From Swiss-Prot:
It catalyses: D-erythro-1-(imidazol-4-yl)glycerol 3-phosphate = 3-(imidazol-4-yl)-2-oxopropyl phosphate + H2O. Its main location: cytoplasm. InterPro entries: IGPD_sf (IPR038494), ImidazoleglycerolP_deHydtase (IPR000807), ImidazoleglycerP_deHydtase_CS (IPR020565), Ribosomal_Su5_D2-typ_SF (IPR020568). Signal peptide: none annotated. It is found in: Cytoplasm. GO terms for molecular function: imidazoleglycerol-phosphate dehydratase activity. This is Imidazoleglycerol-phosphate dehydratase. Belongs to the imidazoleglycerol-phosphate dehydratase family. It comes from Salinispora tropica (strain ATCC BAA-916 / DSM 44818 / JCM 13857 / NBRC 105044 / CNB-440).
Length: 203
């Protein structure tokens, strides 16, 4: 059974196309106009093992907010649709990812109940010219809402001796950890083929 989805989201602020194959090999075709965000979405494809296409045209003449938010909403919707009735999946996934001095833990429950907890230290306001670090939390919140998942992302360690956290490392480790957790949670459990992983019988 194919676990793929295509989502188009069009507003007066953005036009977003997302295609995903949960059982892919990490292929990615990403273009949002926000270079560092593109780099992060490539992490989702590579470390999640998903084939992922994301094409976004947004009102970047204003700022990156709408572009990043609507892309995350469309990505979450694509994951939700690709999962179908969620039968046979592992449901839970977690990963702890180091990136030099940074250590991040992510945990996912494909629960049908959107809830996001995000904890990171204060960071420099921008990575590159247009990626506002304040948007990382909002990306996870938007993704969690539309994917209908519970998501915890905790930066466990970030400080460099005698210096401020490296924002690039802190954010990239988050995307890698979430990707690895999603890979585990969306994986098919061969012991429970066709069985929804809930005593309620639905997610």
């Amino acid at each position: 059974m194919s676990r793929t989805a295509r989502v188009e989201r069009v507003t007066k602020e953005t036009k977003v196309l997302v295609e995903i194959d949960l059982d892919g090999s990490g292929k990615a075709d990403i273009e949002t106009g926000v270079g560092f965000y593109d780099h992060m979405l490539h992490q989702i494809a590579r470390h999640g093992g998903f084939d992922l296409t994301v094409h976004t045209v947004g009102d970047l003449h204003i700022d990156a907010h709408h572009t990043m938010e609507d892309t995350a909403l469309a990505l979450g919707s694509a994951v939700d649709r690709a999962l179908g009735d969620r039968a046979g999946i592992r449901r839970y996934g977690s990963a702890t990812v180091p990136m030099d001095e940074v250590l991040v833990r992510a945990a996912v429950d494909i629960s049908g109940r959107p809830y996001v907890v995000h904890d990171e230290p204060p960071l420099a306001p921008y990575i590159g010219p247009v990626y506002p670090t304040s948007m990382t939390r909002h990306v996870w919140e938007s993704f969690g809402q539309s994917a209908r998942v519970t998501l915890h992302v905790d930066v466990l360690r970030a400080a460099r001796p005698g210096g401020h956290p490296d924002a690039h490392h802190v954010v990239e480790a988050q995307f890698k950890a979430v990707s690895r957790a999603l890979r585990e949670a969306t994986a098919v459990d061969p012991r429970f083929t066709g069985v929804v992983p809930s005593t309620k019988g639905t997610l």
